[in-house]
C-alpha cells in the first residue's frame, strides 16, 4: 500500500493487476486500484476534482483530470472515510501513477491533497519504477 498525508487528509492506494482484462500479446495491461481517503482533520471537506499523471515504462505520459471520482464529489466530515475503486490500462507491462485531489473545506477554502506515486507492475516483472 502507498500513503500520503496532506493537511490531515490521508490518501491510501492499493494497486492490483487485472489479469483477466489484460492481453500481453496485444500490448494491453490493465490494473485496478483501491483508494481510501480519510479525513483526520477537524473540518468537513468535499472532493471537487481529480488529477492523475500516468507514465508508462517507455516514458509516455497521460494526464487525466475531471470533476470528482467515479461520478461523485463526496463530502467527508471529520473522522469520515471514503473508498472507491477504478482502473488504468497501459500499453506496457509497467508504469507509475500519482496525482492530487482538489478539496473544498467548509468555509470555501480550496487546497490540493496528494495522491502518492504508486507502481503498476505486471506479475513476474523484475524491475519497478518506484
UniProtKB/Swiss-Prot annotation:
Top-level taxon in the UniProt lineage: Bacteria
Listed InterPro entries: ApaG_domain, ApaG_sf, Uncharacterised_ApaG
Pfam families found in the cross-reference section: DUF525
Domain ApaG: 3-127
Alphabetical GO biological process terms: error-free translesion synthesis
Name of this protein: Protein ApaG
Organism this protein belongs to: Rhizobium meliloti (strain 1021) (Ensifer meliloti)
Amino acid at each position: 500500500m502507498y500513503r500520503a498525508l496532506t493537511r490531515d487528509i490521508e490518501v491510501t492506494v492499493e494497486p492490483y493487476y487485472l489479469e483477466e482484462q489484460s492481453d500481453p500479446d496485444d500490448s494491453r495491461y490493465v490494473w485496478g486500484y483501491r483508494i481510501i481517503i480519510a479525513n483526520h482533520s477537524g473540518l468537513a471537506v468535499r472532493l471537487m476534482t481529480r488529477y492523475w499523471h500516468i507514465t508508462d515504462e517507455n516514458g509516455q505520459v497521460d494526464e487525466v483530470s475531471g470533476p470528482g471520482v467515479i461520478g461523485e464529489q463526496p463530502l467527508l466530515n471529520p473522522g469520515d472515510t471514503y473508498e472507491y475503486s477504478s482502473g488504468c490500462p497501459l500499453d506496457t507491462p509497467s508504469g507509475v501513477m500519482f496525482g492530487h485531489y482538489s478539496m473544498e473545506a467548509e468555509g470555501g477554502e480550496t487546497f490540493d491533497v496528494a495522491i502518492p506515486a504508486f507502481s503498476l507492475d505486471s506479475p513476474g516483472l523484475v524491475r519497478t519504477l518506484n
